[in-house]
Amino acid sequence: NYKNYTVPEGVYGLTVPIVTEKTTEKEAMNNKRVPRKEMYDFILSDLEKAEKYIDGYEGSALEPGAAMVDGLLARTWLELGYVSDTEFDNDAFKKAQDYAEKAIAKSGKTPLTQNEWEDSANGFNSASSQNSWIWGIPVVSESVGNLTSFNAWISSEATWGYGYYAQFGAGKSLYDSISDSDFRKHSFIDPKKSEYYDYKLAGSSDQIAAFYKRIKSYANIKFRAKYGEIDNYVTGGVGDYPMMRVEEMYFIKMEALARQHNLTAANEVLTDFMSHRITDGSYESSAATEKAFLKEMLLQKRAEFWGEGILIYDYKRLNQGITRGYTGTNFPATMRFNTSGRSPEWNIVITRGEFQANTGITPELNNPDPSQVIPLWE
């Protein structure tokens, strides 16, 4: 049973070694993995110092500010609310809610509009073209090559990168679950292509025609080449990367409310948030149980943060499985795994180099190898 894989003797609850600016070389050579509580105490001590030192400083989307620290604290307290799969900490959920609300208020940020989301020149690559990002990573032309930038890997439009050939996209089941009234669905190419929607694409009419000929169904166009420069990596590859958008704070708030058994308020936050995504006012969240609410919330969060590195934490925190094997699936045959809870592939195996350099970690205290633990769906 693959579930047993995730709880090997002696490893459950261990995180990583703590390294600070005061850690000596000798100490680093015998530095053990610390338990979850010790690690979170360390994380919180750093964040609480940051909260104190940076108080009142607005920063920008590309440098730390008070709202960013509040956002990190909101993330941290949300995780701490889950003591185990069956034990929860309401005080931690309340703190997560409070810090999420602070981040929203201090940042002055607002959810992306449809025009900003679908912008063929600046979509998800520019910290300055919208008012959503609380924190992002700037990218400059000196640090990119045709294959050495995030855009090179993720952009299906950029002719100079891997994304042009890989065409990363949504699973069919996710795509089908997103409402046709939700403009986030336009992040992925429908099987009917331009007959379904007049996608906002970069390039000339000839380039757009060529794009439609080669693009696969469900491929993403969420992440754009900078300035729409699909043929020039020097310019098109210089895309900032979003690390924290204000939208995430609304999701943290609603999850924290639901876990405090305030479903009415949680439904209200989700309904209000979705008015920014299904703008005709037709969406209403009316989940009657926490389980039903969290299921709906996670669906909307998947549509919101696809490709941004946010969702793996939700899946692990909420003990969600993956479903890639099903009738009509568009996943490659070698990737059709189904799990009923956390997937073993999300555990990171520690490499041999760490054992050789750090005697505090031995192979016996490694995370287990997930290779071939889950059978392929057929």
Task: Label the model's feature ranges.
Residues 1-151, 162, 175-378:
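Acidic/polar-rich alpha-helix caps and helix-coil junctions
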